[in-house]
Amino acid sequence: MPLLNTLATPYADALLQVGESRKQSDALADEAKALLSAWSSSQDLQDAMRSPVLSVEGKKKALDSLFSESISPAMLNLLKLLADRQRIGMLDAVLERFLELYRELRGITLAYVTSATALSEQQQDKLTEKVKTVAGTTAVDIDLSVDPDLIGGFVVRLGSQVIDASLRGQVRQLGLSLARA
């Protein structure tokens, strides 16, 4: 287990335990996804929280003013605890680990889907059903991303299994077939 994961696990596990005891795990998972997205998309926020110039109290006040209206007290307490312990810089690792533990607990399979263009809601629903069938599960969490280099189609990653239904993948396979002939 990498060091960052080792450091993140106790915080993630504690958040999951709090969520389970209060029957808020599902809501906390949704908050974690939204917070992870906000954290990932704001380099300024990351820089400010990692800055040694900003005091711990300053970081906690900033977190409070930024998130107190949009997240639960349990999640806000986690943010403040990470700030207190000088670990706010690893927020993304803690949230990702929390989501892993949550999915494990709920039996949810994570699928990474990369498509050539953004998928409509209807396409996402169809894809979700197909992924459930392939994964042999009733619950799936899909992490969508867009890569125009795929030319067309999509690539699905389920653990170590990769399903390449992209035009780029088909062209590559054709090239390999021709090279062997």
Swiss-Prot record:
Concerning PROSITE patterns, the annotation shows: ATPASE_DELTA
Against SUPFAM superfamilies, the record matches this protein to: N-terminal domain of the delta subunit of the F1F0-ATP synthase
What's the chief localization of this chain? membrane
Query: Which species is this UniProt entry from?
Result: Synechococcus sp. (strain RCC307)
**Membrane topology classification:** Peripheral membrane protein
At the top level, the lineage of the source is Bacteria
* Role played: F(1)F(0) ATP synthase produces ATP from ADP in the presence of a proton or sodium gradient. F-type ATPases consist of two structural domains, F(1) containing the extramembraneous catalytic core and F(0) containing the membrane proton channel, linked together by a central stalk and a peripheral stalk. During catalysis, ATP synthesis in the catalytic domain of F(1) is coupled via a rotary mechanism of the central stalk subunits to proton translocation. This protein is part of the stalk that links CF(0) to CF(1). It either transmits conformational changes from CF(0) to CF(1) or is implicated in proton conduction.
Q: Which Gene3D superfamilies match?
A: N-terminal domain of the delta subunit of the F1F0-ATP synthase
Question: Carries keyword Membrane?
Answer: yes
Q: Which UniProt keywords apply?
A: ATP synthesis, CF(1), Hydrogen ion transport, Ion transport, Membrane, Thylakoid, Transport
- Name the chain's protein: ATP synthase subunit delta
Where it sits in the cell: the answer is: Cellular thylakoid membrane
Q: Which family is this protein grouped under?
A: Belongs to the ATPase delta chain family.
Q: Which gene encodes it?
A: atpH
The record ties this protein, via InterPro entries, to: ATP_synth_OSCP/delta_N_sf, ATPase_OSCP/d_CS, ATPase_OSCP/dsu
User: Could you describe the subunit structure of this protein?
Assistant: F-type ATPases have 2 components, F(1) - the catalytic core - and F(0) - the membrane proton channel. F(1) has five subunits: alpha(3), beta(3), gamma(1), delta(1), epsilon(1). CF(0) has four main subunits: a(1), b(1), b'(1) and c(10-14). The alpha and beta chains form an alternating ring which encloses part of the gamma chain. F(1) is attached to F(0) by a central stalk formed by the gamma and epsilon chains, while a peripheral stalk is formed by the delta, b and b' chains.
Question: What GO terms are given for molecular function?
Answer: proton-transporting ATP synthase activity, rotational mechanism
UniProt KW Electron transport keyword: no
Q: Which HAMAP family match?
A: ATP_synth_delta_bact (MF_01416)
